[in-house]
């Protein structure tokens, strides 16, 4: 019977512990999603510089 309070306290501590971070991190602790967003923005910027405004049809098709 002495173990029951200890067991209940342990269950409460486990339930209140912070969860594992769902965002994968790089070795420099930066979320990979921000790196992905940055790369996507850079590619979009280069795409716009290459296409627009000389070939408007190219930009319209590329934006989907």
UniProtKB/Swiss-Prot annotation:
- Which family is annotated? Belongs to the conotoxin T superfamily.
Q: Hey, what tissues is this thing expressed in?
A: Expressed by the venom duct.
Q: Which Pfam families match?
A: Chi-conotoxin
What PTMs does it carry?
Contains 2 disulfide bonds that can be either 'C1-C3, C2-C4' or 'C1-C4, C2-C3', since these disulfide connectivities have been observed for conotoxins with cysteine framework V (for examples, see AC P0DQQ7 and AC P81755).
User: What is the first-listed, main subcellular location in coarse terms?
Assistant: secreted
Give the originating organism: Conus caracteristicus (Characteristic cone)
Query: Which locations, inside or outside the cell, does it occupy?
Result: Secreted
UniProt key word Transmembrane: no
Q: Which InterPro entries has this protein been placed in?
A: T-conotoxin
Renumbered to this chain, the signal peptide range is 1-22
Kindly list the positions at which Isoleucine amide occurs in this protein. Answer: 61
Propeptide position ranges:
23-48
Lineage of source species: Eukaryota, Metazoa, Spiralia, Lophotrochozoa, Mollusca
Q: What is this protein called in UniProt? A: Conotoxin Ca5.3
Task: Print the keywords alphabetically.
Answer: Amidation, Cleavage on pair of basic residues, Disulfide bond, Secreted, Signal, Toxin
GO-annotated molecular function: toxin activity
> What do the Gene Ontology cellular component annotations say?
extracellular region
Notes concerning its domains: The cysteine framework is V (CC-CC).
């Amino acid at each position: 019977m002495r173990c029951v309070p200890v067991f209940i306290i342990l269950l409460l501590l486990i339930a209140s512990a912070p969860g594992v971070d769902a965002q994968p991190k790089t070795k420099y602790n930066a979320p990979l999603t921000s790196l992905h967003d940055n790369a996507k923005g850079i590619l979009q910027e280069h795409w716009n510089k290459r296409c627009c405004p000389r070939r408007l049809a190219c930009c319209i098709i590329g934006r989907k």
